[in-house]
């Protein structure tokens, strides 16, 4: 019995370095990025669905549908990369995002279109900078691949949002 306990102890001690090595390529900054990017992606999907319902212009409705499709895919890709290296992926919005969503959910028509489009330009400008920074700082190849593949999509979304903003007469 004593040798059995010692054997189990040896197995556990041997397993500790292996368990702690999993996810070693990520940093606290990677977790911060995943938190921000995941919540941002969730917000894009929720707001895209809202744009399809509450938007007035066909541009806003189409842009919303595009956001739902693209960000659902990007969320899955980022989530898979993050969890594969031991990072936690949030599944809900931050309190600030919930407040922003509630505000927009009470709007419709032209006022919704303007507010939504302005927010999409602002958010995608910020997202692009965040993803570009993360791409240059992360050391994990899986996370870097997910980030790198998202950047052209975010650039496209920013361009589309600016075009819609211009068409709608927003600043």
Language-model segments: what does each one mean?
Residues 2-9, 14-171:
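His/Met- and acidic-residue-enriched segments that coordinate or traffic transition-metal cofactors
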